[in-house]
Amino acid sequence: MAFWTEKTLAEMTPTEWESLCDGCGKCCLNKLIDDETEELYYTNASCHLLNLETCSCKRYPERFEYVPECTAITVENIASLTWLPDSCAYRRLYLGRTLPSWHPLLTGSKDAMHKAGISVKDKIISEIKVRNIEEHIVLWPLKDID
């Protein structure tokens, strides 16, 4: 049996916890909140530390030094991170769902995730190149399959 089916999120080791991340890059997208409605909007503008090809953080171990507002996803804060996409493994497991068939823990690589259109690969630009963030609002990060 797989560890994510046998353990609660709180029982996982740090290595197991980190391996839940599928590396989609959606949590690294800039998000906007409407002042009036408090509705959340994703943009296709990513954190400047995100590698646009690999969908991985270029400075993961020291990311908080470069981006203080970066949020570490932990078992303690997962309930409050309602901005995480429905496809996120942390969110899925917290909500009692299973890992999707495209998840790298099940497939052995990120390829199936990229092919399913779940990741940010080939869909984003760096926030450094953005002038008007409102022009970059997108709906595709909300996609969740399986």
UniProtKB/Swiss-Prot annotation:
Family matches, as Pfam families: CxxCxxCC
InterPro entries on file: Puta_zinc/iron-chelating_dom, UCP006173
Family affiliation: Belongs to the UPF0260 family.
NCBIfam families referenced in this protein's UniProt entry, alphabetically: PRK05170.1-4 (NF003500), PRK05170.1-5 (NF003501), PRK05170.2-5 (NF003507)
UniProt protein name: UPF0260 protein Sden_1632
Upper lineage: Bacteria, Pseudomonadati, Pseudomonadota, Gammaproteobacteria, Alteromonadales
